[in-house]
């Protein structure tokens, strides 16, 4: 146990009292992102070090590792606290998404350290999908780069509304206010093109030296704003799902004995209470909530984000992937949708291909009807493309094999977020955010089956000399 933790426990009056205090602290999930070598891992290491979250044995190990793998000369290489893979330490880069936990007197934090290299953009998107705030690091010597723009766009695409632009390595530009002002202006000019109403803040800092990370810098008297830690401790996060209608995706049917049948899952949005009239989709059957069962016992009501088991008054057919919502809400099932896609596979995404789709516990199949555009992250313009390459971001039209109940991702990430799975290798090849569900009345009917379209795409790709026509293009 480190001395800081021991002191906190003593101040709270024992381990049990300390654990209760921890449970009542608010939790902030955030990620660090930016271009390669901007100092993301070093910043997290500095946060852990300056908030005294490192155990004595970890600190001793860090001294030894800094001598073998360090890139900071005689100084501690704080990035090694986060970069755990051997390849990461040898190359001095981040490859995988690394998660770390720490807490202060005001708040608990879960950090996702994401890679900066373009070929690992898919890892960055994975890390951003569960976060509420993004720290975008910019090297003060280089300014705003392509990866900065890419990560900014992906973060906002995944619903992150709070961006902290940390202009790092200020010590290498002599803590120049002019440099900070120029980069701030450049980023704000770019950010005008980002979607949504964003909360953007700027902090000049040096992760290596500790300036403006957890304590105010004496080297930058011209900056009177909060430190990075103060921003993280005080930012107010308004969760979108709290204000949304009730959504309860069924994860599994809990049947421990003959006398109990419950439907387990995590309440995706809204609230539910005992006695509430609910509807099961896609069947449309209605019932009342008889019990709300949790690990700590029965509850009268539950809120978004809580893992619960619902017991209904009627025995009706409900299975994994079904959705429970308020009975008076009209939410039609759809079979088509336009989806924002971040592609993560070497094999491009092309019209006519079919993939397994997973969304809110349900697994089905979808066909790619077409690619409307790919986003150029340099200027956020849209351009027409025939396929979506690795790390490409674009808007895609999908048709599902069965009707699904979908929300727009910006309204509900659980019922609006999906993944693409390769049907042969079972590898996740893409992430999708529902842009707009297409109602059955406006969905264009297809005269070809999913199998026919997939076979057509296969023949055109591998046997072009046969001269097979494009069924999608010739409709």
UniProtKB/Swiss-Prot annotation:
It is an enzyme of class 2 (transferase). Residues 34-41 are annotated as: G1. Pfam families: GTP-eEF1A_C (PF22594), GTP_EFTU (PF00009). InterPro entries: CysN_GTP-bd, CysN_II, CysN_NoDQ_III, G_TR_CS, GTP-eEF1A_C, P-loop_NTPase, Small_GTP-bd, SO4_adenylTrfase_lsu. Its EC number is 2.7.7.4. Residues 92-96 are annotated as: G2. Pathway: Sulfur metabolism; hydrogen sulfide biosynthesis; sulfite from sulfate: step 1/3. Belongs to the TRAFAC class translation factor GTPase superfamily. Classic translation factor GTPase family. CysN/NodQ subfamily. This is Sulfate adenylyltransferase subunit 1. It comes from Escherichia coli O139:H28 (strain E24377A / ETEC). The gene is cysN.
């Amino acid at each position: 146990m480190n001395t800081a933790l021991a002191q906190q426990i003593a101040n709270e009056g024992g381990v049990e009292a300390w654990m209760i205090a921890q449970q009542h602290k608010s939790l902030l999930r955030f990620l660090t992102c930016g271009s390669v070598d901007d100092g993301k891992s070093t910043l997290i290491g500095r946060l852990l070090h300056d908030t005294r979250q490192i155990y004595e044995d970890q600190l001793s190990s860090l001294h030894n590792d800094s001598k073998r793998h360090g890139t900071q000369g005689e100084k501690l290489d704080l990035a090694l606290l986060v970069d755990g893979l051997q390849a990461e330490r040898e190359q001095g880069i981040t490859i995988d998404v690394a998660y770390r936990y720490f807490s202060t007197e005001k708040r608990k934090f879960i950090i996702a350290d994401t890679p900066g290299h373009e070929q690992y953009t898919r890892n960055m998107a994975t890390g951003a999908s569960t976060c509420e705030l993004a720290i975008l690091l910019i090297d003060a010597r280089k300014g705003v780069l392509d990866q900065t723009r890419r990560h900014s766009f992906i973060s906002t695409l995944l619903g992150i509304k709070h961006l902290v632009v940390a202009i790092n390595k200020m010590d290498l530009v002599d803590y120049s206010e002019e440099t900070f002002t120029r980069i701030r202006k450049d980023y704000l000019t770019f950010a005008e093109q980002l979607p949504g109403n964003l909360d953007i803040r700027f902090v000049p800092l040096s992760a290596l030296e500790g300036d403006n990370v957890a304590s105010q810098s004496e080297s930058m008297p011209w900056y009177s704003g909060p430190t990075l830690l103060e921003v993280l401790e005080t930012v107010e996060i308004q969760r979108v799902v709290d204000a949304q209608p009730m959504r309860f995706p069924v994860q599994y049917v809990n049947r421990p004995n003959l006398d109990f049948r419950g439907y387990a899952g995590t309440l995706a949005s809204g609230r539910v209470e005992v006695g509430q009239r609910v509807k099961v989709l896609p069947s449309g059957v209605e019932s009342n909530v008889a019990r709300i069962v949790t690990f700590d016992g029965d509850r009268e009501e539950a809120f978004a984000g809580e893992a619960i088991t619902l017991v209904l008054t009627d025995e009706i057919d409900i299975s994994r992937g079904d959705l429970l919502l308020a009975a008076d809400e009209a939410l039609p099932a759809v079979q088509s949708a336009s989806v924002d896609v971040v592609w993560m596979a070497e094999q491009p995404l092309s019209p006519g291909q079919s993939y397994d789709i997973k969304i809110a516990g349900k697994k089905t199949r979808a066909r790619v009807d077409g690619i409307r555009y790919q986003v150029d992250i340099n200027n956020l313009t849209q351009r027409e493309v025939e396929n979506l390459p690795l790390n490409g971001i674009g808007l895609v039209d999908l048709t599902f094999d069965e009707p699904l109940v979908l929300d727009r991702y910006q309204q509900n990430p659980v019922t609006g977020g999906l993944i693409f799975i390769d049907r042969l290798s079972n590898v996740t090849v893409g992430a999708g955010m529902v842009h707009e569900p297409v109602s059955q009345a406006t969905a264009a009917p297809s005269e070809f089956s999913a199998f026919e379209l997939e076979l057509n795409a296969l023949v055109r790709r591998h046997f072009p000399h046969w001269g097979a026509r494009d069924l999608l293009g010739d409709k």
